[in-house]
Design a protein with these regions (language model features):
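Short, flexible, surface-exposed loop segments at domain boundaries
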Residues: 2-6, 17, 22-208
């Protein structure tokens, strides 16, 4: 069970979370910078989370007063339709295509979040494409044409690629053993304050 003060913390609307998510990667000032940490919750102590990162490091994160929490849940590859707005972490291929490492399908309320193509930190040399699915082909796996303002990418999605979507969440999801992606402000002394947290629902490890 989450600590009572944590459970009472106000969570912003789902759309407000999407607006915050769109700012990932922007600098937060000279004294602070935006950080993203993939981790497992070890303990919840009031407004603090004790985490073990995927690289094995220990980290304590404090929660901002307006921390936004969202759940990540699995969906099927077949749920990606023409016109879907998606994000996709991928690896560049020699032929210029992108091979998907994961795909996250945005709810309509989050359409436009982070639109574009850029480097990503899931793996060395990985990329992130957020855009609208145009052409969609293939019966074993899928090949997607994803368009965004100023460009497009052809993304090959193998049949075993994890596909997820977002649901509104609450701090009640922040429990020991939950897998999370924490985004927030980190100061030069290593202190981190979480402003938004994505939580894998029912033990899911967020693939992004």
């Amino acid at each position: 069970m989450p600590h009572p003060p944590l459970a009472r913390r106000h969570v912003g609307r789902f759309i407000a979370w999407a607006v915050l998510l769109a700012t990932i990667g922007a600098a937060a000032g000279k004294a602070q910078q935006v950080a993203r940490v993939r981790a497992t919750i070890e303990a919840v102590n009031g407004n603090n989370l004790s985490l073990t990162t995927r690289t094995g490091d220990k980290l304590t994160v404090s929660l901002a007063p307006n921390v936004a929490v969202v759940a990540i849940v699995p969906v099927r590859l077949e749920d990606i339709k023409q016109g879907s707005f998606i994000g996709c972490a991928a690896m560049p291929e020699p032929d210029g295509t992108q091979r998907a490492l994961e795909v996250h399908v945005f709810p309509e309320s989050m359409r436009g979040t982070g639109e574009g193509y850029r480097p990503f930190d899931l793996k060395p040399q990985s990329t992130m494409t957020n855009g609208t699915v145009g052409a969609l082909t293939g019966t074993v796996g899928r090949t997607l044409t994803v368009t965004y303002q100023g460009g497009k990418q052809t993304i090959v999605v193998p049949p075993d690629t994890p596909v997820v979507t977002y649901e509104p969440g609450s701090p009640a999801l922040l429990v020991p053993n939950a897998h999370v992606i924490v985004m927030g402000r980190r100061t030069p002394d290593g202190t981190m304050t979480a402003t938004r947290i994505s939580v894998g629902k029912d033990g899911l490890v967020p693939p992004m």
